[in-house]
Regions:
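Jelly-roll (double-stranded beta-helix
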Residues: 1-63, 68-244
Length: 244
């Protein structure tokens, strides 16, 4: 188990292949080069942030902590909402309505396409700048460079780093799924007195899912394997280490 204190992590500038201002705190990551690689960040976007309509070859969960994120025809995520953005399903264009803070978990999913590490994305971005420019989330090749004139920024990076054309997986869901946890009821967790849960959903044949857990004072929760937890309030002990 690894515990990261949010306040111990510095803000950094990121998403340079998209448009506008984005800073993040990088909390956790998996093992680069593996199909199950993942990345967990908390990002802050300003009102000038913009991202074109696009899709992923990985899965994504989003927790809107502050502000409102606008995904155009796919709807808005207000503070407190949770979103599941499945691989292959287009969404956006995306923009922030003022300052927005979001916890984002991205991970290799059912198609087996894996997930690029932040270091790989940065390296690919810098290498591609030798052949073109990133504008508004799109990579545009210079006129004297062979290849497609314009490509989604992340797709261009993925193809450059993998040396092959990206084949998007067929979407298991047509659209992102946005959830309002406030409308869920708390359920007791069997065998764990004082622990309640809001199971928000389980998705695809790989059964990736999201839940909200609440612990009464003095209660104990047994964490599952291959799970990532974000503590939003309170304090306690996790595997003999404190969290605040």
């Amino acid at each position: 188990m690894k515990i990261v204190q949010y306040d111990d992590v510095e803000w950094k500038r990121g998403l340079q292949h998209r448009g506008g201002t984005f800073h993040y705190r990088h909390l956790l990551n998996g093992t680069p080069g593996t199909l199950g690689n993942f990345q967990f960040n908390i990002g802050q976007l300003e009102g000038d942030f913009a991202s074109p309509r696009h899709r992923h070859n990985f899965d994504q969960f989003r927790i809107q902590l502050e502000g409102t994120m606008n995904f155009d025809r796919n709807g808005k995520m207000a503070a407190g909402s949770v979103g599941y953005f499945p691989e292959g399903a287009p969404y956006g264009p995306q923009r922030s309505e003022g300052t927005s803070v979001t916890a984002v978990l991205q991970f290799g999913s059912a198609s087996g396409s894996g997930y690029l590490s932040r270091e790989e994305v940065y390296a690919g971005t810098e290498e591609l700048k030798k052949f073109g420019t990133f504008e508004g989330g799109i990579f545009r090749r210079n006129d004297d460079v062979e290849g497609r004139r314009q490509t989604d920024g992340y797709q261009a990076i993925w193809e450059h780093m993998n040396g092959q054309r990206m084949e998007y997986p067929k979407p298991r869901y047509r659209d992102p799924i946005m959830l309002d946890p406030a409308n869920y009821e708390w359920l007791p967790v069997d065998g764990m007195p004082g622990v309640s849960e809001k199971p928000l959903g389980s998705f695809t044949e790989r059964q990736c899912g999201a839940s909200i857990i609440k612990l009464a004072r003095g209660s104990t929760y047994r964490a599952g394997e291959r799970s990532v937890y974000l503590v939003l309030s309170g304090s306690g002990i996790a595997y003999d280490a404190p969290y605040l």
